[in-house]
Amino acid sequence: MAEAGRALFYQVRVGLGYLATIRKDGGPRVHPVCPVIAHGGLYLFIGNHSPKAQDLRRDGRFALHTFPCPDVDDEFFVAGTAQRVDDASVRAVVYATYTATGASTSDDTLYELRLQRALHAKYAARPSWPPVYSKWPGRPEPDRQIRNEIAP
């Protein structure tokens, strides 16, 4: 599942995804971002004055979804909590990986995205339904189960 996620985030040279955070009023906020897979983890450089940085400082919960694929309908999603990274050696490794893709950043804050769950939807050739889902962790906690129908 991890390799499928990597391939979907890195469809082009730089990682691309949509980051969902929680605004101060509790509503959702969605941002395009450039995730970095490096140093055994998933990271984001975020501008210090960005609304998404403010959201993550206040409430670290996030969801991250890959950009749509031009050739297939496969999807990859992760969720968890973001934590600021102040370790200079970790930042150097992640920065080198990020800039090797041609991307650039300066004094942006580095966040590690600590994963609590992931979902990969694998589709057959277009048009096909339903996809084959792979989840991590495989068995959700009872209070986190996703309902597939709308309750009356």
Predicted regions and their residues:
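Short beta-strand segments
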Residues: V14-N48, Q54-L56, F62-P68, E75-V78
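Generic structural signal for secondary-structure transition and capping sites
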Residues: G15-L16, R61, A103, A118
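A generic structural signal for nonpolar/aromatic side chains embedded in well-ordered alpha-helices
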Residues: F9-Q11, L56, Y98, L113
